[in-house]
Regions:
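Acidic/histidine-rich helix-loop elements
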Residues: 12-34, 59, 90-102, 123-132, ...
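Active-site neighborhood of phospho(di)ester-bond hydrolases with catalytic His/Asp-centered motifs
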Residues: 13-15, 50-56, 80-86, 119, ...
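Short, electropositive alpha-helical surface patch
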Residues: 64-79, 169-178, 205-214, 263-265
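Binuclear metal-dependent phosphoesterase catalytic core
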Residues: 180, 202-265
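Metal-dependent catalytic neighborhoods of phosphoester/phosphodiester hydrolases
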Residues: 23-24, 53-74, 89-102, 128, ...
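N-terminal active-site segment of His-dependent metallophosphoesterases
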Residues: 1-68, 161
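His/acidic metal-ligating clusters that form di-metal
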Residues: 39-50, 127-207, 243-245, 261-264
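Active-site-proximal beta-strand elements of phosphoester/diester hydrolases
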Residues: 8-22, 112-122, 151-153, 206-212, ...
């Protein structure tokens, strides 16, 4: 993936769209198509270099749902990298989103950054895990890369997000995952979907990020899903040439400059 190594890399993270074959279908009382459409003006205004889809793109894994999401994101006019969530069918999803971890971790170089997408899903399960083979492939991709910094994306949270309703469905082998992460000091950011609310934490020199949903979000730190009246959102990231990570959220009526951001060096 081409990018000017002297400029920051602007990424728009879109997650947990839960679109169904029926465009009028409701998800937790919200219209998934309509709420994603509401975010498009803010997405265009952010002017990203690429879009990163972090799973649960579809609610029913239907071809029609992936078609509509792909059509909407095509209006942003940049490449789309995508990984599946527990609601997705990878075989169906990759027909519209070919750039993803469909045959093992997917690595793309953009400027000084290596972006690695990993599939944490297990067929028929809500929780996730990584096979040893996938983790070894991840090691190999980092060894083969001359990038200065690394971002890793997955669907399931590798750390608790303090929301019991979703923490029971987390990544089941986080210890193995972080063992491989800790082998390479170039890893600066790990980001995921699944949790349906904003999350930020720092672990050593790595920023850990949970993304909100484009359809319905929960108030954080709740025992059960509790609809957040703030509405749908997506995450923006700016990955600096110095390894810094700036990030914040975009909502339907908010501009990137108007959002609170975090930075790690």
């Amino acid at each position: 993936m081409a990018s000017n190594g002297e400029n920051s890399l602007k990424i728009l993270q879109v997650s947990d769209c839960h679109v169904s074959s029926d465009p009028n279908a409701s998800y937790r009382g919200q219209n998934a198509d309509l709420n994603l459409q509401k975010l498009l003006p803010a997405m265009h205004a952010f002017s990203p270099d690429l879009v990163l889809l972090t799973g649960d793109v579809s609610e029913d894994a239907s071809p029609a749902s992936y078609d509509r999401v792909a059509d909407m994101l095509e209006t942003v006019g940049v490449p789309v990298l995508a990984l599946p969530g527990n609601h997705d069918d990878p075989a169906v999803m990759q027909c519209r989103f070919p750039r993803g971890p469909w045959h093992g971790p997917c690595a793309s170089t953009a400027g000084r950054w290596l972006l690695v997408l990993m599939d944490s899903t297990e067929p028929g399960r809500v929780s996730g895990s990584f096979t040893q083979q996938a983790l070894e492939q991840f090691d190999g991709q980092l060894r083969d890369s001359s990038a200065n910094f690394v971002l890793v994306a997955l669907h399931h949270q590798p750390v608790p997000v303090n929301s019991p309703w979703i923490d029971r469905y987390a990544l089941e082998n986080p210890g193995s995952f972080f063992k491989h992460i800790d082998r390479d000091s170039r890893v600066r950011c790990i980001t995921w979907g699944h949790v349906h609310h904003d999350f930020w934490k720092q672990r050593n020199d790595v920023v850990l990020l949970g993304a909100p949903s484009t359809v319905a979000n929960s108030l954080p730190r709740t025992g059960r899903f509790t609809l957040d009246p703030a509405g749908p959102a997506c995450r923006w990231l700016e990955l600096g040439v110095d390894g810094a990570v700036d990030t914040g959220l975009l909502g339907p009526v908010q501009s990137p400059a108007g959002k609170t951001s975090q930075r790690i060096r």
